[in-house]
Amino acid sequence: MIAPLAQFIDWSALQVAAMIPSIRKCARGDSKLTEAVEFLNGPNFIPAESKPAALEFKSKIHFTFPSPRLCEFVENNIVHGRLYRRAKDWRKFPTLILLHGGVDFVTHRCRFPAMVPAIHRAGCNAATLVAPYHFQRGVRRVEAFDHLRVAEAFGQGVAEIRALTGWLLNQGCPSVGLFGYSLGGWLAGLAATSDARLKAIVLALPGVRRNYRATHGEGILWTPMRKVLEKQTAAREALDKTPLNLTLSQPVLPKENILLMQGRYDLLVEPELSEEIWQTWKQPEIWRLPHGHLSWMLTRGINRRVLDWLAPRLDPQAISEKGTH
């Protein structure tokens, strides 16, 4: 895609995002920075121990489980997800967990379900998770998300990914992989720095740290939002000195099992960030796509390419058996 069109799509999305209530709440929450930094630098951000989730199925596909990291809001303490089993003997196959972007209802509700048939053909089950404070887990009565609440939400999201991973492995799945886009890629990256049970990960245009162009307010036309974001530069710089910044940690799985996807025309998460993590993570495979943060989804054959990359890494034996079921 030509750069001007890709960037116009991103710019338009940025204007819409600036008006979304949950985004505005995050922008207004410039408090509890000291507590957030202490939490992120402490052992409770991503604890060593992770217990398997206790899934309860509401239908053949939809499930819930109690979050392993509780907060004061009942709505956010219940994790919602979907499991798309490949076959009746689904436990014999790897599972790919799909993680959506921030306030990214379209990917979660439309793109991910559309990917399921291809994932099944690749010999895998598919699962999705709703990130903290998103969709069914939204909390309207919060006036502002301060820095501590945002930090805790990141820790909660990682804990929930690890809990679902534990449940899948306990069920007998030979391996678990992650595909995360934007915010989901950031959460997948954090999980990959702490959980060696993960077999392979794909970080598609991931967030890497708190301080980037969109959080500076660059390109936002709505003046009140832009000014609020501009005032938080020092806070973001402080947060970027903690393990929330992916470039300050190393993954615990081999770099051969990590795939980075970059949008060369990305206006929301600039490509320099993926280059930075590519270098600090010892140069795993990276695909530099001629697209923006949103238009990369239009790349012809991208799902097939990703699944062709993932399939042999998740479990070669299970993949070789896929044609028999």
Which residues does each PLM region occupy?
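Hydrolase active-site cap/lid region
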Residues: 190-237, 288
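Short alpha-helix in the alpha/beta-hydrolase fold that links the catalytic acid
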Residues: 256, 270-279
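Alpha/beta-hydrolase active-site loop
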Residues: 145-171
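Catalytic histidine-centered segment of alpha/beta-hydrolase-like enzymes
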Residues: 292-303
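N-terminal targeting or regulatory segments adjacent to alpha/beta-hydrolase or S9 domains
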Residues: 1-68, 323-325
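Cap/lid segment of the alpha/beta-hydrolase catalytic domain
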Residues: 98-155
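Short beta-strand/loop motif that positions the catalytic acidic residue
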Residues: 254, 260-262
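Acidic catalytic loop of the alpha/beta-hydrolase fold
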Residues: 264-269, 294-295
